[in-house]
């Protein structure tokens, strides 16, 4: 049984990846400082070391106590608007700490590294056509630049060390584990599906549509949404590709279909059975009108296919919000 280390494994995407690897027969060790991650969302079968990835003594302990085959790196900061007002934090948490982590792992002989990147590395693609892995990389905010920096660093380190790496560029991640084992408990979330579902269950009074005058069919931004469980399975498939082939890989992870902001809100209203309070607001700086993945590469090379559509994302997200409400009521 291979053992993988997952940084940020108590976070939204990380906790789903933990279940994905456990379900696939791996042993999972997690390093998470729980600054945004939730201990209760972590699979009981995973062993947690609470602390920061910058703590080399902690990492040394993990590597001495376990034979780590590879590392999946999710830890970091992930809110685009926040990165604009506090860029230093994003370069520190995402770029510099990732550099230190990779440097340490290589020095300890870790073979494989799978990095959680983002479609933010593409910036504002022209024309609205789906973007492939070969599209222009032109981030427009510190979050995107911090991710691209790590991508470049991993490639360069691999060239001289032989580190076997994978890079997954996520589009808009949504939904929760269909089995109800974990979900999105992100504090002050900005993800559209999460926010709309919080409004539906009464956690928020309403939500805003940032821009209604885009050159899209209904005037609102169009995005490619991918279910978090599909994304977890993409990590397993990519990791097994690295193990099997010894080749490096970079893949987009998306459905290849676009849904507008208004479409998503209507779908939440339909699933919930009530109208949400929605207000129009000014455009946000740097929001492309359309951002859709060309995920041909991962489909052809790994046979990965998305199993869940937008309705599944919304139904599982709503189920998680209702569960959190019930848990809160039981505690109070």
Regions found by a protein language model. Give the residues of each.
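Residue-level signature of the cytosolic catalytic core of signaling kinases
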Residues: 51, 185-189, 257, 306
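Short, flexible, glycine-rich and Lys/Arg-enriched loop motifs at helix boundaries
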Residues: 39, 171-192, 202-223
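N-terminal Rossmann-like NAD(P)+-binding domain of SDR-like oxidoreductases, especially those catalyzing
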Residues: 1-173
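Short-chain dehydrogenase/reductase
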Residues: 91, 140-148, 182-194, 224-225
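Short, contiguous clusters of charged residues that form electrostatic/catalytic patches at enzyme active sites
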Residues: 57, 61, 96-100, 152, ...
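Residues that form or immediately flank small-molecule/cofactor binding pockets and catalytic motifs
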Residues: 53, 136, 172-175, 212-214, ...
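C-terminal substrate-binding subdomain of Rossmann-fold SDR/epimerase-dehydratase oxidoreductases
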Residues: 195, 201-332
């Amino acid at each position: 049984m291979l053992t993988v280390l997952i940084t940020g494994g108590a976070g939204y995407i990380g906790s789903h990846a933990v279940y994905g690897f456990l379900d696939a027969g791996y042993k999972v060790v997690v390093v998470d400082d729980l600054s945004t991650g939730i201990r209760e969302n972590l699979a009981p079968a995973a062993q947690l070391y609470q602390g920061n990835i910058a703590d080399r003594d902690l990492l040394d302990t993990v590597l001495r106590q376990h034979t780590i085959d590879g590392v999946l790196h999710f830890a970091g900061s992930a809110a685009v608007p926040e990165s604009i007002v506090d860029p230093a934090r994003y370069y520190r948490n995402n770029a510099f700490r990732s550099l230190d982590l990779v440097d340490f792992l290589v020095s300890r002989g870790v073979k494989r590294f799978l990095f959680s990147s983002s479609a933010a590395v593409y910036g504002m693609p022209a024309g609205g056509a789906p973007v492939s892995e070969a599209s222009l990389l032109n981030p427009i905010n510190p979050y995107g630049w911090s991710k691209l920096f790590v991508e470049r660093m991993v490639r360069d380190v691999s060239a001289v060390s032989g580190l076997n790496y994978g890079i997954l560029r996520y589009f808009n991640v949504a939904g929760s584990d269909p089995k109800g084992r974990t979900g999105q408990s992100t504090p002050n979330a900005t993800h559209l599906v999460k926010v709309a579902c919080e409004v539906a269950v009464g956690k928020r009074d309403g939500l805003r549509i940032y821009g209604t005058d885009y050159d899209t069919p209904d005037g609102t931004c169009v995005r490619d949404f991918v279910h978090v469980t599909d994304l977890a399975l993409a990590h397993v498939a990519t990791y097994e590709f690295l193990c099997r082939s010894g080749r490096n890989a970079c893949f987009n992870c998306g459905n290849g279909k676009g849904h507008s902001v208004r479409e998503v809100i209507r779908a939440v209203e339909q699933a919930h059975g009530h109208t949400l309070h929605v207000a129009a607001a000014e455009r946000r700086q740097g929001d492309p009108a359309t951002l859709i993945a060309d995920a041909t590469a991962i489909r052809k090379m790994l046979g990965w296919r998305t199993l869940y559509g937008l309705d599944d994302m919304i139904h599982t997200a709503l189920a998680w919000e209702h569960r959190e409400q019930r848990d809160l009521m039981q505690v109070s």
